[in-house]
Structure formats: structure tokens, C-alpha cells
């Protein structure tokens, strides 16, 4: 199947109903995308599919055909990554890639309300969210 993966053309052979999460990690070696719950409840596996945040554990590989898929590796050195470090928006790190990708999808300078709504599907057991919100607002 052909797609654009992290800004580059890619062709990956995998069963169409395999989870996008598993294809990214196992076939493509992109292990920055984390599996938390495997049920679409935690947001740890969030990636961008045609610039929209999706839980990769819920998306069949076939849905990525011809699409643009962006993982945390595709952001390179995005300012949000530094902001998360500067504002201690990450502790254990399991939720961080998904949080950053969900935040990227919010666009530039989102309001606190937009951040809270945009990250509602991304759970964090460590930070209490305020540091994450500050990190996103700082960029």
C-alpha cells in the first residue's frame, strides 16, 4: 500500500485489517507511537491521518492507503517537543507522543479551552495536565 509517511512517499506491505499502530511499530520501525489501552480510550497511540488526530489502535491499515500519516518521528524537532521539556509536560513519557501530535493538530496559539477540548481523548496519569497545557500555550 502506498502512502505518505512522515512527509516521504512510502510503500508498506501489511494485511489491510492490521492496526495502523502495529504496522507503524512492527513494519516501519516507528516505535515512538505508543500503545496504552489498545481500545482508543487513552490517546497514547495518537497519530495524524491527513492532519487529523486519530487513535492508531483503532484504524485499520487499509484506511491509510493514499493518506498522509504523521508520527512523532515525523515532527523532527518541533517546538512543542522542547516546550514539553521546558515546562515538565512529560514524566513517564507514554502519553507524550500522542499529546504532542494532538496539540499539533490544534494549530498555532490555541486557547486554553481549545487545548482542553482537543486533548480530551489523551490521558495522562503523571502530570495533572496543567504542565501540558502550559507547554502548549508557550509555543
Stretch-by-stretch model annotation:
Residues 1-139:
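Signature of N-terminal electron-transfer/Fe-S-associated modules in redox systems
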Amino acid at each position: 500500500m502506498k502512502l505518505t509517511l512522515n512527509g516521504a512517499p512510502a510503500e508498506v506491505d501489511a494485511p489491510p485489517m492490521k492496526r495502523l499502530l502495529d504496522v507503524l511499530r512492527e513494519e516501519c520501525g516507528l516505535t515512538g507511537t505508543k500503545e496504552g489501552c489498545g481500545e482508543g480510550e487513552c490517546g497514547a497511540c495518537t497519530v495524524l491521518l491527513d492532519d487529523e488526530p486519530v487513535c492508531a489502535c483503532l484504524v485499520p491499515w487499509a484506511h491509510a492507503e493514499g493518506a498522509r500519516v504523521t508520527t512523532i518521528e515525523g515532527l523532527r524537532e518541533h517546538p512543542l517537543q522542547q516546550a514539553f521539556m521546558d515546562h515538565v509536560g512529560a514524566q513517564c513519557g507514554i502519553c507524550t507522543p500522542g499529546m504532542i501530535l494532538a496539540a499539533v493538530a490544534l494549530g498555532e496559539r490555541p486557547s486554553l479551552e481549545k487545548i482542553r477540548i482537543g486533548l480530551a481523548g489523551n490521558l495522562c496519569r503523571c502530570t495533572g495536565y496543567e504542565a501540558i497545557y502550559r507547554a502548549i500555550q508557550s509555543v
